[in-house]
Regions:
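Short sequence/structural segments immediately N-terminal
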Residues: 1-371
Length: 371
């Protein structure tokens, strides 16, 4: 009996040791091979092949993808029972897990994103009483706010009316970001390792980064920013000059104008979408032709370039350009910085350029500074 128990104990111990060694050995193999181990399954071969031609070619699969035992068992079940879809797509939980991995290498970009409105949570967006009391939530909201959510709007938030109170009903999702990194970035794509883009302001446009791409939840595919079109916009009947910077095409996917309302002057005359309609902020007036990213940081929408980047500090009329009556200085100003025109303030004509001495003479005297 003792011999049998000893043999059983040795057998169980050996099996446990083999399982532990096998598990850790397999994990080490898959982690250390930069995807070659993952590519041994035919479902993953194409994805590994693409990433080996991408800027993340020296990054291992497990550096970005969650690889718990539960995930591995789920993958094994799918592989064995043949339920693999024609094209493998990430679930929302997978994307959210990967977002936290992005900051391991992209700390600066992640910090900017996390500090800005693009990191807004599902609760902040879909339980906003100010918005929801005016406009009822609909599936189309998920196109930009929750493109990786796998269900319909009714599966995410209730009630679907303008009375409320509203609550995110999907457990564990309320405090997660609705617009993760992969909403605008495609990781598995071909391209060279990237460098810092030219920071100069451009009207014609710069070479667009390979990673910039819009994720379309209907097609469950990324569309590269360079392949997206730019809209034709009007100011009344006049065709507005729109920056040809290809990065701006990505912004337009969500910060978009609306078609003219039925019965409006623009609709009657078939002028087309108007600047400033919907969520559009296309520059017009003194800033016409300048792209979004000329002034804005794409990760947090903050202005990365001040007025003095392009303008002398003192304007032609002797006023500090950053203190003029525009929304740059005061968000409540009637003169939106995106559309301000000289004539908004100078209805009787533009004044002649003043000399520095004349401009200084108009300024209030401050002891120790200018007087």
């Amino acid at each position: 009996m003792k011999t049998f128990l000893r043999f059983a104990a040795i057998t169980v111990g050996a099996a446990a040791l083999l399982a532990v060694c096998g598990t850790y050995g397999a994990s080490y193999y898959y982690t250390s091979q930069y995807g070659q181990g993952c590519a041994s399954c035919h479902e993953m071969a194409a994805f590994v092949s693409v990433v080996h031609s991408a800027p993340h070619r020296t990054t291992g699969c497990m550096d970005c993808h969650e690889a718990s035992l539960a995930t591995k068992l789920r993958h094994m079940r799918i592989h064995i029972f043949g339920t693999v879809p024609e094209t493998i797509r990430l679930r929302d939980v997978d994307v959210l897990a990967m977002t936290s991995s992005c900051k391991s290498c992209h700390q600066h970009e992640y910090a900017n994103w996390h500090a800005g409105p693009h990191s807004a949570t599902y609760t902040q967006i879909f339980a906003d009483s100010t918005h929801n009391s005016k406009r009822m939530l609909m599936d189309d909201c998920l196109r930009c706010h929750g493109m990786y959510f796998g269900g319909a709007i009714g599966d995410l938030v209730q009630p679907l009316n303008t009375k409320g109170p509203w609550k995110v009903t999907r457990a564990g999702l309320g405090d997660e970001s609705a617009m993760p990194c992969m909403a605008c970035h495609q990781v598995h794509r071909e391209g060279a390792q990237e460098t810092r883009p030219d920071s100069r302001i451009s009207v014609a446009g710069l070479a667009v980064q390979d990673s910039l791409a819009f994720y379309d939840r209907r097609e469950t595919l990324h569309f590269a920013a360079a392949s997206l079109g730019l809209p034709q916009l009007h100011d009344g009947a006049r065709l507005v000059t729109v920056s040809q910077d290809p990065r701006q095409a990505l912004c337009y996917q969500c910060h978009a104008p609306r078609e003219p309302e039925t019965g409006s002057l623009a609709a009657t005359n078939e002028w087309g979408p108007q600047v400033g309609s919907g969520d559009d902020r296309t520059p017009m007036g003194v800033h016409e032709g300048i792209g979004c990213v000329a002034c804005h940081n794409g990760h947090n929408e903050n202005t990365r370039a001040s007025c003095k980047t392009c303008h002398p500090q003192m304007s032609n009329c002797g006023i500090d350009v950053e203190k003029m009556d525009t929304t740059y200085a005061d968000s409540k100003s009637a003169h939106n910085i995106h559309w301000v025109k000289c004539a908004d303030c100078h209805q009787h004509g533009i004044p002649k350029v003043k000399t520095p001495a004349a401009a200084k003479a108009k300024l209030p005297t401050t002891p120790g500074i200018n007087g």
